[in-house]
Amino acid sequence: MPHFTVVPVDGPRRGDYDNLEGLSWVDYGERAEREDPDGHGNHRESSPFLCPLEASRGSDYYDRNLALFEEELDIRPKVSSLLGKLVSYTNLTQGAKEHEEAESGEGTRRRAAKAPSMGTLMGVYLPCLQNIFGVILFLRLTWMVGTAGVLQALLIVLICCCCTLLTAISMSAIATNGVVPAGGSYFMISRSLGPEFGGAVGLCFYLGTTFAAAMYILGAIEILLTYIAPPAAIFYPSGTHDTSNATLNNMRVYGTVFLSFMTLVVFVGVKYVNKFASLFLACVIISILSIYAGGIKSMFDPPVFPVCMLGNRTLSRDQFDICAKTTMVDNETVATRLWSFFCHSPNLTTDSCDPYFLLNNVTEIPGIPGAAAGVLQENLWSAYLEKGEVVEKRGLPSTDAVGLKENLPLYVVADIATSFTVLVGIFFPSVTGIMAGSNRSGDLRDAQKSIPVGTILAIVTTSLVYFSSVVLFGACIEGVVLRDKYGDGVSRNLVVGTLAWPSPWVIVVGSFFSTCGAGLQSLTGAPRLLQAIAKDNIIPFLRVFGHGKANGEPTWALLLTALIAELGILIASLDMVAPILSMFFLMCYLFVNLACAVQTLLRTPNWRPRFKYYHWALSFLGMSLCLALMFVSSWYYALVAMLIAGMIYKYIEYQGAEKEWGDGIRGLSLSAARYALLRLEEGPPHTKNWRPQLLVLLKLDEDLHVKYPRLLTFASQLKAGKGLTIVGSVIQGSFLESYGEAQAAEQTIKNMMKIEKVKGFCQVVVASKVREGLAHLIQSCGLGGMRHNSVVLGWPYGWRQSEDPRAWKTFIDTVRCTTAAHLALLVPKNIAFYPSNHERYLEGHIDVWWIVHDGGMLMLLPFLLRQHKVWRKCRMRIFTVAQMDDNSIQMKKDLAVFLYHLRLEAEVEVVEMHNSDISAYTYERTLMMEQRSQMLRQMRLTKTEREREAQLVKDRHSALRLESLYSDEEDEAAAGADKIQMTWTRDKYMTEPWDPSHTPDNFRELVHIKPDQSNVRRMHTAVKLNEVIVTRSHDARLVLLNMPGPPKNSEGDENYMEFLEVLTEGLERVLLVRGGGREVITIYS
């Protein structure tokens, strides 16, 4: 499945957030600056909703079915138009795009990207196999089995494979938590842990990959000079003690030549490396199959590789041909070359012979007894050796004697001191390479599926091969041959090759080409990793390595990689380079596990991996295992690697990397104090870190009791976002006089918060007007980065029955304030019917009606609610609306793909709303609304007596300073005969008798009023949408719905309230949602 990014919709680019997340950033400031010709934003039909500029943009804005949302369709686009632009793939990381734009000046250059087409097998499984199987399997596994014994060798393999398996589980969780663009492992680590950790670990990963190239080259040289062409050696030992020096010098010279040639190949074109990758992989697979074939054959026909023993000591067979002290030539006993070596004379004299040679017999034993010979029992136990110690076979008769030191090269001796920890460090590189699949994330058709399946299958496959190989080697090969690292005792044959069928050359040639191929792959991957780090510009002095050839090949990074690899070549010992490699990879794997554990424990809203088989305890175990392996294998290397990583971390921190990648470490700042608050001041949170920080505006009754406690219940059920919760209320009056009431109200709210298990803060303000107090709360609540980004506002019940317009004016003014402050708004309607924390919905649906795109709040809120036990069993359904010209089938497919990448499980349904004529009911409903509004307006203008009476009522109630949240004086309406009949219909108008002499002229005009056409269209939208929603969602546990924006001028406020009432009529529980002008959910990891 392709990767998706959402492109900006009809608007200019506004910085990095648009580039990264792809969705248009709503700038209300710019909207405010676009004034209309009449100065009031009025439509030519005197509509308070639609301005002439928008009306001229085409039929989209005159769509009858969406007329209620038409004012903001330019910044909150229809879902149908948004889904049509989803499928726009890019395989560039954010840093790469920034770097590319910086180089091109205007930032307009874009490369055409091929559609990713690789599946799990070719894209992840086989590359991982090729990278995991390598030089250690062919050159060191037999030696490890002979030295550690089968049991301890199995333990080493188990520990190392468990480490990589746990890391792969963590990596799978991170990789499936959104689209991973090209950049693979480094991208995942850096975007999960932040620029400091990301840069440190990225460089460690780079150094590990670079030293891997050196290790593979050294392995190829060892195979070449030891088994393929020994005469090609340039340096030869000048004495008995110069053997190792000559070997190391040969490795350095040939290693440098090989490295130069491979660097040239990579420089000329990486396409040649990719072409030969399949050939190299075939070599690996054929070599492994030949080992198994040889093991099976050895059960009934073991190969002939005799080993010459002097007493119980193993002799180096490459220096003599006959395994005997004497031989018969022409019926005459003559000394063999072996006698000449130990006695320093061709004569059969014993004067100068080695004492051990004289006292012990020379015997010949089979090097490959076969699986049926029972050597497994002998090879179960360890036989660790010190450097220079002779390889001996337990059980053979031997007479101890002090041998001559100069004869030591005639024996097979240990070249290094061995122990369990040393073998762990040497073997661990043979299980690395698990990142090969994630490194190709940009080429995968469905990375979220392929990376976990392919990587874990590759680890399971290689682990089974390693386990079976350990048992096979222990069961088929003689112990002294296993401990013979270079095959000196079997005539300088590759030990694993002696077991292979049909010929040892299959393994020798196959391993040579596979190690060369692995070296080329490392030299190809490491420069690209360095280039990605350099393009992110988190380490300034590395920026030069972000540049390359015209086609993007990292020339300078390749040069630096070759220089660092040369340092590994100069070490010249495979056994010395392998632990260095282990340190850097273990460091990388440690931080992958740390990233997964941090994200899981923080439970950020964006942490929604499709891979479900992870747990923070597994990640923590993997992290602990990586740390333990680092110190077990080589504690001083571990300290050096950690010191390097620490220095890089502090350097990046000192330089002040101005990067915000939505990393998990920033999430920890929410639980810290001053230091965290200062860091949170640096800028707005990344979309991946966005969580609802709620400001809940409560209404108190006259006794200072919370009027709607279910608002707090609802806030507590959103606590899965792990965000901030502030509960606010307003006391009307003077602060000096009402301070005590404010304190009492605050205590009441805190008690209710405790009952409803809301963890947060309470703030009560005193203001002369309630709407001013609400504006103060919206502006000033919070501290630094700990500020609210969402407002929970109750619905103004009874607004129709109140003759005072302030009953709904305060509500609409608060909506406008949240919009101006770029805050999200949640309006739960019928809050009394919302469930308490003790209820459980065992079934049912949470329905989302996604009509216009508003930043993704509609998708995120149900996900957070379903984390709570009340809503956990509910299923999520997403409905969107298709018009006549929309392809509803394609919309459904696109929406399903989009939700797949958002990692949200939901049923998708596209509801077709065809353009229909405006019904008589809609016309009548609009007429009723406008008559009522006009009547109230005329009464307020002409009935001075009623105004005077209302003023008296207000004066009588001025002592009550506690005021409603949504109206300044909602309950001050006078009772009695003067009360106005608010429900005004044409029928009532016709049936009630009236006297024209007592009716103002303006009131006589009400019967002749014609409804405004824009209002008719909006009412049509509300009625049609309500019909569809009630039909589909009448049994839903909760309905989430886009909240239309308020009118631009205040004359349409009452009509706006009526539209909202009609839109939500007949629904038991409704949550009206209005985004804050920024994205809150993303497909990226």
UniProtKB/Swiss-Prot annotation:
Chloride 2 binds at Y589. It catalyses: K(+)(in) + chloride(in) = K(+)(out) + chloride(out). Pfam families: AA_permease, SLC12. The chain crosses the membrane at residues 120-141, 150-172, 197-225, 249-271, 272-297, 420-440, 451-473, 505-531, 555-575, 576-598, 613-635, 636-651. ATP binds at L697, K699, K707, Y708, V730, G794, W795, Y797. N-glycosylated. Keywords: ATP-binding, Cell membrane, Chloride, Disulfide bond, Glycoprotein, Ion transport, Membrane, Metal-binding, Nucleotide-binding, Phosphoprotein, Potassium, Potassium transport, Symport, Transmembrane, Transmembrane helix, Transport. Residues 665-681 are annotated as: Scissor helix. Residues 28-46 have a biased composition (Basic and acidic residues). The modification Phosphoserine is found at S24, S47, S59, S81, S88, S734, S916, S967, S1050. Its main location: membrane. It is found in: Cell membrane. K(+) binds at N131, I132, Y216, P429, T432. Inhibited by WNK3. Glycans are attached at N245, N312, N331, N347. Residues 142-149, 226-248, 298-419, 474-504 are extracellular. GO terms for cellular component: membrane; plasma membrane; synapse. InterPro entries: AA-permease/SLC12A_dom (IPR004841), KCC1 (IPR000622), KCL_cotranspt (IPR000076), SLC12_C (IPR018491), SLC12A_fam (IPR004842). Homodimer; adopts a domain-swap conformation at the scissor helices connecting the transmembrane domain and C-terminal domain. Heterodimer with other K-Cl cotransporters. Belongs to the SLC12A transporter family. K/Cl co-transporter subfamily. Activated by N-ethylmaleimide (NEM). Inhibited by furosemide and bumetanide. Mediates electroneutral potassium-chloride cotransport when activated by cell swelling. May contribute to cell volume homeostasis in single cells. May be involved in the regulation of basolateral Cl(-) exit in NaCl absorbing epithelia. PANTHER family: SOLUTE CARRIER FAMILY 12 MEMBER 4 (PTHR11827:SF46), SOLUTE CARRIER FAMILY 12, CATION COTRANSPORTERS (PTHR11827). This is Solute carrier family 12 member 4. The lineage of its organism: Eukaryota, Metazoa, Chordata, Craniata, Vertebrata.
